[in-house]
Amino acid sequence: MNITKSSALVFLVTTLISFFSIEVFSDTIEEIVVKGSWRQIPVAQEDSSVIFLDSEVIKAQSMKHFEQLSYLVPNLNFAASDSRARYFQIRGIGERSGYQGTPNSSVGFLIDDIDYSGQGGIATTFDVDQIEVYRGPQGSRIGANALAGLIYIQTKDPTENFEGTSELTKGTYGITSAGVAFGGPLDKNKDITYRLVLRKDQADGFRKNLYLQRSDTSRKNESTSRLKVKWQLTGDTQLKFLISQVDLDDPADIWTIDGSLNTLADRPGMDSQKTNSYGIKVFHSFEGFELQSFTSATDTDVIFSYDADWGNAYSHAPYTYDYFSETQRDRKSFNQELRAVSNAADFSKDHFIEWVAGVNYLELKETNLKKDDGLYGDPSDPYGPYASKFESSSRYKSSNFSVFGNLDYLLSAALKLSMGVRWEDWEADYSDSLQESFNPTDQMSGGKISLIKSTVNGSSLYASLAKGYKQGGFNLGLGLGANSINNNVAYDPEFLTNYEIGINTKLLDSTINFNGVLFYSDREDQQVLISTQTDPSDPNTFSFLTQNAAEGVNHGLEMKMDMDITESLGIFLNLGILKTEIKNWQSRRDLEGRAQAHAPEKSYALGLNWIPTTNTYLAIDFTGNTSFYYSDSHNNRSKSYTMANLNLGYVKNQWNYEFWVRNLFDEYYAVRGFYFGNEAPNFIDTLYERHGDPRHIGISVRYDF
């Protein structure tokens, strides 16, 4: 702690010196507007570590999914157990799976202000306006779903004039994508505007099943449709309506014994998800404040299945080893938030205070139907083979009710004190066919206080203290109920206290845009999940146990720099440095002082953008991270990697032609690892890794109208 405090002091002093002594600015860099906060504000007024991905960065990605964009964000990782990444980690904090059907997210995930926490797989990014990744607890803004941070995606809103875009992509591994988005005023009435989006993405999936002689057992077959309507009812009242559907029909044949991209499964699984969403926003202006209502609902159907033995009769011979698992999941959510947002403060008019007050209600319902079957036989056993079959169902319902508020006070025209608080009540009801039932409740509170110094030229310096929280829960598969006396049944809420200082400034006549953040986080009652396999010969017999470690520590540095070397050449660097530690976990002394899972010490993205002529451009970037532990259940680690991507484009009037390569040097890198025995007859514990996508090449054509 002393070293960290000393580092923080040095960082603060140096940033203060540069902040007050270097001649900066002329406003040549376009102002970034924060859209994920309660009110849209310039980035200079933001008091969080947030990284922005604008529409140009998003359009430049050949594969339109947030999973691809996440590589550009330091201290953001994901667990690739499934066909699409659903679970993300920010600064080493976040779930890596969701097998049990009791949602409890650490990373908030909002798309157009609709909560998809724990369902990040649906985050297709065609016709997206901006993505904001908030690193650090958002206790006052979001509450229990954002202990580690928040991923906020804003799709394009309807425009006053008719406009649109279309895109066609073709690439190796069967990559084919087509999309169109358009909208504007409805007839001649500009009070009602709309935007319609249709998109289809397909790919073979970068794997080949040698047993079935097929290259599509991990294919991507994804569609996105979205309609947004904005209606200016009166001069004081505005309504926004959204309806969307994302349908991911993706088989999941991704795990292999040898870690290669050649699978052997005889019964490939599925990782499909279909989500229908509805949202209504109402804004009504009163004298001095605006009343806002956000109403949303989602309905999600998931099929998650897999060939648990990863092989076939020939690969396991002479042993009979054949297991399969399928989970059918239905999740429904309803969310209602009411806010009163004051008019912005203005020091020059003696308006020193701006405030937000509101209430939020979130209801979640989930049902799961799980079916497992298996067959195991040893040729030396005259009584085999032995068949197994297991089926269970469960129901889960939770409700979160919270009250929140935020007060900003202008101490001067350039100095603002901000204070926010949130109180939340959580109740859950769980029951299953195994006679397990639980009715836990928690009351939690969090908040934030910050001091922000800004200048008229767009630079800012801030210091903040924030507290986030995450509800507790219960462990399944112990054969116990809520009233049973066992220390392993329930676990407590986790709290995170985060200390942060940051700077956002422009240097050298605005040719450099620099953001830097130093943070230190204390985790109280850290929730740690470990898994065990009860029957080594049955890969479907894993149990999961979550316990509270006494504490954890996460601290580090985050930096983003964009530099215009010339009018036609620019470079960028995004860097994250992260140190994590598990401390004082009484039941797992072997993990004392070890780094937390999925928390690489260094993550980075750097690249250049070059415009050699008026009509051509070249973009190349390098992304990567250092090794990290796969789990808190074992000490196996990934290997460090760096991956390169290239885009070469030509622009002519409204047409854009692009040649792209992802994973330019065909880097072989792992994104997830399991440690258990899956090879008969001894079932020796072995590290099995899932590797990322190989090099793929394609062309994209875009027409804007």
What label would you give each PLM region?
Residues K281-A308, S454, G458-A466, A490-H555, ...:
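Membrane-embedded beta-barrel scaffold of Gram-negative outer-membrane proteins
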Residues V341-N343, W355-G358, L410, K416-L417, ...:
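Gram-negative outer-membrane beta-barrel transporters
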Residues E67, Y71-I114:
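Extracytoplasmic beta-strand/coil segments of soluble accessory domains associated
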Residues I571, S627-Y629, Y650-F705:
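C-terminal beta-signal and adjacent terminal beta-strands/loops
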Residues G98-Y99, S106-P137:
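Short acidic/polar hinge/loop motifs at secondary-structure boundaries
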Residues E163-T165, K170-A203, R207-D250, K274-I280, ...:
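Transmembrane beta-barrel wall of Gram-negative outer-membrane proteins
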Residues K230-G235, S244, A340-N343, F352-V356, ...:
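Structural signature of Gram-negative outer-membrane beta-barrels, strongest in the C-terminal barrel
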Residues E31, E67, Y87-Q89, V133, ...:
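N-terminal periplasmic accessory domains that precede
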